[in-house]
Amino acid sequence: MDLSDIRREYIHGGLRRKDLQANPIDQFNLWLQQAIDANLSDPTAMTVATVDEHGQPFQRIVLLKNVDDAGFVFYTNLGSRKAQHIAHNNKISLHFPWHPLERQVHITGVAEKLTAMENMKYFMSRPKESQIAAIASHQSSRISARGVLEGKYLELKQKFANGEIPVPSFWGGYRIRPESLEFWQGGEHRLHDRFLYSRQDDNWTVDRLAP
């Protein structure tokens, strides 16, 4: 399939250094809020890239659940493939694509596990159905049929019908402490604007990159 004729112009305007926030987390929050305000589908969806012990990269879509100066937080099954990769190599890449705004953000950083208290606080805030699903699914393991998963879900739903659901030991979150953040804004004639924030000790440097 030849896709060479699929192209479009970027029309939403550029990004200038004078428009940037000094702190990249502030810049990220500004863009994220604009994506939310624009009613984009799944504005908190991000690609999480990890590498296995053989150097093979893997990607998957995960939802961002918190962001602050400490980093970017997501939750997962601690026995999942991504968790196994992180245990081997905790360097991670995140990518947020906000296509309608002609923007994307690329983040590199180091993953660290959240505390048991942080895990419990978020787990208890989830809908009960989501809590049950977290226990029913041993993520990335092989199953013979969908019915096996659905049967386990219904079994647990009945078991916890009238009680509190405990946080499973194999479920938790990670915080990605950022080392770099790149902000990309589409530009006319493919002259896109790219700014890279790089951590230098407790400060950030900002460089413009060629598109």
UniProtKB/Swiss-Prot annotation:
PROSITE patterns documented for this protein: PYRIDOX_OXIDASE (PS01064)
Cofactors, names only? FMN
Q: Which InterPro entries match?
A: Pyridox_Oxase (IPR000659), Pyridox_Oxase_CS (IPR019740), Pyridox_Oxase_N (IPR011576), Pyridoxamine_oxidase_dimer_C (IPR019576), Split_barrel_FMN-bd (IPR012349)
Record-linked Pfam families: PNP_phzG_C (PF10590), PNPOx_N (PF01243)
Q: What GO molecular functions are on record for this protein?
A: FMN binding; pyridoxamine phosphate oxidase activity
Cofactor: record remark: Binds 1 FMN per subunit.
Which residue windows are coiled coil?
none
- Catalytic activity entry: pyridoxamine 5'-phosphate + O2 + H2O = pyridoxal 5'-phosphate + H2O2 + NH4(+); pyridoxine 5'-phosphate + O2 = pyridoxal 5'-phosphate + H2O2
Q: Keywords, A to Z?
A: Flavoprotein, FMN, Oxidoreductase, Pyridoxine biosynthesis
The processes (GO biological process) annotated in the record are:
pyridoxal phosphate biosynthetic process; pyridoxine biosynthetic process
Pathway(s) per entry: Cofactor metabolism; pyridoxal 5'-phosphate salvage; pyridoxal 5'-phosphate from pyridoxamine 5'-phosphate: step 1/1; Cofactor metabolism; pyridoxal 5'-phosphate salvage; pyridoxal 5'-phosphate from pyridoxine 5'-phosphate: step 1/1
Which sites bind FMN? 60-65, 75-76, 81-82, 104, 139-140, 184, 194
Enzyme Commission designation:
1.4.3.5
The protein's assembly and partners: Homodimer.
PANTHER family per UniProt: PYRIDOXINE-5'-PHOSPHATE OXIDASE, PYRIDOXINE-5-PHOSPHATE OXIDASE
General function of this protein:
Catalyzes the oxidation of either pyridoxine 5'-phosphate (PNP) or pyridoxamine 5'-phosphate (PMP) into pyridoxal 5'-phosphate (PLP).
The similarity comment for this entry is: Belongs to the pyridoxamine 5'-phosphate oxidase family.
Query: What protein am I looking at?
Result: Pyridoxine/pyridoxamine 5'-phosphate oxidase
What is the species listed in this Swiss-Prot or TrEMBL entry? Vibrio cholerae serotype O1 (strain ATCC 39315 / El Tor Inaba N16961)
